Amino acid sequence: MQEIEIFCDGSSLGNPGPGGYAAILRYKDKEKTISGGENFTTNNRMELRALNEALKILKRPCHITLYSDSQYVCQAINVWLVNWQKKNFAKVKNVDLWKEFVKVSKGHSIVAVWIKGHNGHAENERCNSLAKLEAQKRVKTTT
């Protein structure tokens, strides 16, 4: 299986409010950047949306190392998700996106690594800037 790195970040102005997401996918020396947003959302939803959209791009099963500054996403992937599924996602927030994650992550091996946000991590900073830009675009369209 190919070794892929995914860096992602989500932003929400107001939380909830206009939001944006961004992800960088890296395979060897190749990179692809994606971004987007929603008019009314939360930072956690945008973080997870970034990951889901990145996973949709992959065409074959991969070993993925995910780098995120979201404890929520990292803990969910590494620890909580198995129990959430056993309990059919009872009382889980953002259940639509977690169910989508289960679908789009099928066949992949994913390890989530938490990185401290706003701490000079180059890819995280790039994703953060893009996610904020996407959120700001939506402020202009919703006012």
From Swiss-Prot:
<dbReference type="InterPro" id="IPR036397">
    <property type="entry name" value="RNaseH_sf"/>
</dbReference>
<dbReference type="GO" id="GO:0003676">
    <property type="term" value="F:nucleic acid binding"/>
</dbReference>
<dbReference type="GO" id="GO:0000287">
    <property type="term" value="F:magnesium ion binding"/>
</dbReference>
<feature type="binding site">
    <location>
        <position position="9"/>
    </location>
    <ligand>
        <name>Mg(2+) 2</name>
    </ligand>
</feature>
<dbReference type="InterPro" id="IPR012337">
    <property type="entry name" value="RNaseH-like_sf"/>
</dbReference>
<keyword id="KW-0963">Cytoplasm</keyword>
<feature type="binding site">
    <location>
        <position position="47"/>
    </location>
    <ligand>
        <name>Mg(2+) 1</name>
    </ligand>
</feature>
<dbReference type="InterPro" id="IPR050092">
    <property type="entry name" value="RNase_H"/>
</dbReference>
<dbReference type="GO" id="GO:0005737">
    <property type="term" value="C:cytoplasm"/>
</dbReference>
<keyword id="KW-0255">Endonuclease</keyword>
<dbReference type="GO" id="GO:0004523">
    <property type="term" value="F:RNA-DNA hybrid ribonuclease activity"/>
</dbReference>
<comment type="function">
    <text>Endonuclease that specifically degrades the RNA of RNA-DNA hybrids.</text>
</comment>
<keyword id="KW-0540">Nuclease</keyword>
<keyword id="KW-0460">Magnesium</keyword>
<dbReference type="InterPro" id="IPR002156">
    <property type="entry name" value="RNaseH_domain"/>
</dbReference>
<feature type="binding site">
    <location>
        <position position="128"/>
    </location>
    <ligand>
        <name>Mg(2+) 2</name>
    </ligand>
</feature>
<comment type="subunit">
    <text>Monomer.</text>
</comment>
<keyword id="KW-0479">Metal-binding</keyword>
<dbReference type="InterPro" id="IPR022892">
    <property type="entry name" value="RNaseHI"/>
</dbReference>
<feature type="domain" description="RNase H type-1">
    <location>
        <begin position="1"/>
        <end position="136"/>
    </location>
</feature>
<dbReference type="Pfam" id="PF00075">
    <property type="entry name" value="RNase_H"/>
</dbReference>
<keyword id="KW-0378">Hydrolase</keyword>
<comment type="similarity">
    <text>Belongs to the RNase H family.</text>
</comment>
<feature type="binding site">
    <location>
        <position position="69"/>
    </location>
    <ligand>
        <name>Mg(2+) 1</name>
    </ligand>
</feature>
<dbReference type="GO" id="GO:0043137">
    <property type="term" value="P:DNA replication, removal of RNA primer"/>
</dbReference>
<protein>
    <recommendedName>
        <fullName>Ribonuclease HI</fullName>
        <ecNumber>3.1.26.4</ecNumber>
    </recommendedName>
</protein>
<feature type="binding site">
    <location>
        <position position="9"/>
    </location>
    <ligand>
        <name>Mg(2+) 1</name>
    </ligand>
</feature>
